[in-house]
Design a protein with these regions (language model features):
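Adenosine-phosphate binding glycine-rich loop
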Residues: 140, 232-322
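Glycine-rich phosphate/diphosphate-binding loop of Rossmann-like nucleotide-binding domains
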Residues: 123-211
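Flexible, glycine/charged-enriched surface loops at secondary-structure junctions
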Residues: 47-53, 87-92, 144-153, 201, ...
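N-terminal ligand-binding/catalytic initiation module
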Residues: 1-119
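Rossmann-like adenosine-cofactor binding region
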Residues: 184-260
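Conserved active-site and cofactor/substrate-binding residues in soluble primary-metabolism enzymes
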Residues: 4, 27-35, 68-72, 76, ...
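General beta-strand structural signal in soluble alpha/beta enzymes
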Residues: 88-92, 112-114, 179-181, 199-200, ...
Length: 323
């Protein structure tokens, strides 16, 4: 089938490793390996901070998700996951849809994020977006002491799965949006319904905004972008937003509120965890369990922000310590 994939299990201390499958056209297998290892480590922290009985794992399929997807490819991937015997469960991520996961499900039970069946949790993106939205409200309350986003400008980078749902929520809460994405057709569509201003991908760092929401790929907070950002807060859905831990230190010193990525974006994996839980107990998907876990995660974010201010330590260090 021409499948080239890497599955990384970072930790199974808390339970089976769970994490999404990303299909991306990596320049080399070395680049893919570096990405999957970084992402799998991030999942260990994300699952721990959300208090889920799961370890961290991640997988990548090397290829162009727009042109190289076939049902056979995902069945071959499913067979690879199956050989691990439940040590790792796969789910949707960048470039991989609910339909793709359903294809893998034909050959292995070790996939999550399905649409069919009583335990199915579906697309995790809306729940991820809800967590990012609530995190943004927390930041607005802390910095500007307001309960909505009226009068605030948010720059949204990436309006794919999560970014699109997030944009709708931010718009409804009164925020002015400036957005970018490499998918210009989708960008035009989302911008039209949220009255957003559109900018070129690299210009997103230079716009005048109050909050920056990175919702595309990781490491966008790096030496090249740091001095261009004029925002007071960073709250987004992307994984591994800080290129290095030092960037978190610099943001802290500059008085920029950085809401740690794996706390902010934990909604999706909580949703996926509910499906695993239902499957283990023979029960059904439980939306109220998801809501309880999500509110607790937001309490944790509040604790991170409060401790960061009190202890004069960067938020990413506090979050790591809690996880």
């Amino acid at each position: 089938t021409g499948l080239r994939a890497i599955i990384a299990v970072h930790s199974s201390a808390r339970g089976p490793a769970v994490g999404g499958t990303r299909m991306w056209n990596y320049a080399s297998s070395a680049e893919a390996l570096e990405d999957v290892l970084r992402l799998s480590r991030g999942m260990s922290y994300k699952n721990a901070v959300a208090d889920l009985e799961m370890g961290g794992g991640k997988s990548v399929i090397i290829g162009d998700s727009r042109t190289q997807k076939t049902p056979e490819l995902f069945r071959a991937f499913g067979r690879a996951v199956d050989t691990l015997g439940g040590l790792y469960y796969a789910a949707e991520d960048v470039g991989v849809s609910v339909e793709d996961i359903a294809e893998a499900r034909k050959v292995t039970p070790y996939v999550l994020g399905l649409n069919d069946g009583p335990e199915a949790s579906g697309d995790p993106s809306p729940v991820t977006a809800e967590g990012v939205y609530r995190s943004t409200l927390l930041a607005a309350k802390r910095l500007w002491n307001q309960d909505d986003l009226t009068g605030l400008t948010v720059s949204v980078q990436g309006i794919g799965h999560v970014g699109g749902y997030l944009a709708d929520k931010l718009h409804a809460a009164g925020a002015k949006l400036i957005m970018t994405d490499v998918n210009t057709a989708l960008l035009a569509e989302v911008a039209a319904r949220t009255s957003a201003e559109i900018v070129a991908p690299d210009a997103i760092y230079d716009v005048k905004a109050d909050i920056y929401a990175p919702c595309a790929l990781g490491a966008t907070l790096n030496p090249r972008t740091l001095d261009r950002l004029t925002v007071k807060a960073v709250v987004g859905a992307a994984n591994n937003q800080l290129a290095t831990p030092e960037i978190g230190q610099i943001l802290f010193e500059r008085g920029v509120l950085y809401a740690p990525d794996y706390v902010v974006n934990g909604g999706g994996i909580i949703n996926v965890a509910s499906e695993l839980r239902a499957r283990q107990t023979g029960g059904a998907y439980d939306a109220s369990w998801v809501e309880t876990k999500l509110s607790r995660l937001m309490d944790t974010l509040e604790e991170v922000l409060e401790r960061s201010a009190a202890e004069k330590r960067p938020t990413h260090e506090i979050a790591d310590a809690i996880a």
